[in-house]
């Protein structure tokens, strides 16, 4: 089992370390050829505009869409990665995006850097709360058909799944808790 971490920008190293802590082969993905043999891909937090522009420039977005459409790839976007996965980015209609999930996301919905916070979340499928880190986090404002809400922060949607796609507003890689990474590996395993 090999999981790729989109390594164009952002906190990809932390995701890679979480996967390696689980004994999973983790590879950095910068070009379409790096997707060879990869069963799952994590798109990290960082700057969603930069991630989108670089992924388009390198042809990664199209390669990822093709692999997903063929049933060969699970994809998880965290924070900026979740924004990149959305079909709609509220207020930024021209921002480059992967656009795989029928969700509408609002960037920086919780405010600026100084308004970042940590919170224990009840996440569907986990036996105890998950300590989530929200840094200039987006909110999933609308979900389309077939999208399941896995977690909320108050009344705000912060974690969703559709088929083999995940999008989370928070940074699970900054917690030391590998439970979500382990679940994603199982999702990618199919």
What are these model-derived regions, one by one?
Residues 8, 80, 170:
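Cofactor-binding loop segments of dinucleotide-utilizing enzymes, especially the Rossmann-like FAD-
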Residues 12, 35, 84, 91, ...:
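Flexible, glycine-rich phosphate/dinucleotide-binding loops
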Residues 107-190:
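Amide-donor transfer/coupling interface in amidating biosynthetic enzymes
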Residues 48-122:
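Cysteine-nucleophile active-site neighborhood
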